[in-house]
A protein has these predicted regions:
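Conserved N-proximal alpha/beta basic substrate-recognition cap immediately N-terminal to
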Residues: 1-68, 79
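C-terminal active-site "lid" helix and adjoining low-complexity regulatory extension at the edge
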Residues: 5, 9, 18, 198-276
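Short secondary-structure junctions
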Residues: 51-54, 67-69, 104-105, 182-187
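Alpha-helix N-cap recognition
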Residues: 60-62, 88-92
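ATP-grasp fold ATP-binding core
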Residues: 67-87, 105-116, 192
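Active-site ExK catalytic segment of metal-dependent nucleases
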Residues: 74, 139, 210-214
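Short helix/loop capping segments that flank catalytic or ligand/cofactor-binding pockets
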Residues: 81-83, 96, 219
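Phosphate-binding site of ATP-dependent enzymes
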Residues: 90-170, 174-175, 179, 194-207
Length: 276
């Protein structure tokens, strides 16, 4: 909670300092917002992912039958793993369908990535040079249960995160950034993916689990080994560059009512059944 508050207030402070409207934050990724659905649709965003990195997924319309289990049943939009369920068999999938039959949020089914490790790459685009990142952190999601195919998130008490950025050299970070740029021009994003190793990730051998475009949390701030001083420094660096890229939003970009539509949808998603 304290991290979130410091993120919010320092961002507002920097926006005021450079004379930009902090509410413009919600327009950073507005070109990728689906106004008719009122969400950043996972299906829309999935189409932006190059085929080599894309997991098989589809709307849960009952027409696709030959899934490789396990699969994850997800709301078409959600944050921090809200509403995600795992099915290890056809029977479990049908049980989940029955339990969520009354949900007004459409579901998608995504096959599991089989790579050994899970990573989260958080970045903010550079306002000075959009071919570069102003902030780029590489983090590993770990689960104390050691189970296969866990649903990791900041709300899962069994999940914790380690930042790996400092252990990577410039060449490795540049390669990872090149992969991230292939998805599209996102002002801010957090990409969840699975890969067998850092070397495999650098070489482009991975599958994308999810791309978060709506208030993505800088996961590196949750590394339990970070000192208070390191956290505060990272927060201020993040929000300073976030304010800069907010000011850099093109003036002719069509504004979308992202915040209010997403707030309403978020309330509905949080009412969905959660994985125990």
């Amino acid at each position: 909670m304290h991290i979130r508050l410091l993120l919010i207030f320092s961002y507002i402070y920097y926006c005021v300092r450079i004379k930009t409207n902090p509410a413009r934050y919600f327009q950073l990724n507005a070109p990728f917002f689906n106004p008719s659905k009122g969400i950043f649709s996972k299906l829309d965003i999935d189409r932006l992912i190059p085929q080599r990195w894309r997991l098989r997924q589809s709307a849960d319309n009952g027409l696709v039958k030959d899934f490789q289990f396990p699969v994850f049943v997800k709301p078409e939009w959600g944050q921090n793993a809200y509403g995600i369920r795992r099915a290890d068999s056809e029977q479990e999938l049908n049980d989940i369908r029955h339990q969520t039959a009354d949900s007004i949020m459409p579901r998608i089914i995504q096959e599991a990535a089989t790579e050994a490790r899970e990573f989260e790459v958080f970045y903010i685009l550079s306002a000075a040079d959009e071919t570069k990142s102003a902030v780029l952190t590489v983090n590993e999601a770990l689960n104390i249960t050691k189970t296969d195919f866990p649903i990791n998130s900041i709300n899962n008490s069994n999940t914790f995160y380690r930042e790996l950025t400092a252990s990577l050299n410039e060449e490795q970070l540049s390669a990872i950034w090149a992969h991230m740029r292939a998805f599209g021009r996102f002002g801010i994003s957090r990409v969840g993916l699975r890969s067998d190793s850092i070397d495999a990730l650098v070489n482009g051998d991975f599958h994308v689990i999810e791309i978060n475009l709506f208030v993505p949390m800088p996961i590196n701030l949750l590394d339990p080994d970070k000192t208070l001083k390191q956290r505060v420094s990272a927060i201020l660096n993040t929000t300073w560059h976030l304010a800069q890229i907010t000011r850099h939003i093109p003036k002719d970009q069509v504004a979308q009512s992202v915040f209010f539509k997403k707030w309403w949808v978020a309330r509905k998603v949080k009412m969905l059944p959660q994985t125990p």
